Swiss-Prot record:
HAMAP family: Ribosomal_bL36 (MF_00251). GO terms for molecular function: structural constituent of ribosome. Belongs to the bacterial ribosomal protein bL36 family. One of its GO terms (cellular component) is mitochondrial inner membrane. This is Large ribosomal subunit protein bL36m. GO terms for biological process: mitochondrial translation; translation. Component of the mitochondrial large ribosomal subunit (mt-LSU). Mature mammalian 55S mitochondrial ribosomes consist of a small (28S) and a large (39S) subunit. The 28S small subunit contains a 12S ribosomal RNA (12S mt-rRNA) and 30 different proteins. The 39S large subunit contains a 16S rRNA (16S mt-rRNA), a copy of mitochondrial valine transfer RNA (mt-tRNA(Val)), which plays an integral structural role, and 52 different proteins. bL36m has a zinc binding site. NCBIfam families: rpmJ_bact. The gene is MRPL36. It is found in: Mitochondrion. Keywords: Mitochondrion, Ribonucleoprotein, Ribosomal protein, Transit peptide. InterPro entries: Mitoribosomal_bL36m, Ribosomal_bL36, Ribosomal_bL36_sp.
Length: 103
């Protein structure tokens, strides 16, 4: 969801960067100082995409998987057991990190 939102916000900027000349201040900000003579990116939108690289974006939706356990335990009062596809699972609505799967 956040990835889609960011793409919707950045795509117009990428489109504009192909057809207009960037102001000197913005190009200096994106490509470093002019004295450093940093090579300009070949692709028109590469500078904007480099600002949105995965290392710079906050991790908004961490993907937490199941902990594989031989013996399942309810870790709080809201944990509950479910049997699906021949395995037992522990789910918790208040603490999603309590999710467990029987090995």
């Amino acid at each position: 969801m956040a990835n889609l939102f960011i793409r919707k916000m950045v795509n117009p900027l990428l489109y504009l960067s192909r057809h207009t000349v960037k102001p000197r201040a913005l190009s200096t900000f994106l490509f470093g100082s002019i004295r450093g003579a940093a090579p300009v990116a070949v692709e028109p939108g590469a500078a904007v995409r480099s600002l949105l690289s995965p290392g710079l974006l906050p991790h908004l939706l961490p993907a937490l998987g199941f902990k594989n356990k031989t013996v399942l335990k309810k870790r709080c009062k809201d944990c509950y057991l479910v049997k699906r596809r021949g395995r037992w699972y522990v789910y918790c609505k208040t603490h999603p990190r309590h999710k467990q799967r029987q090995m």
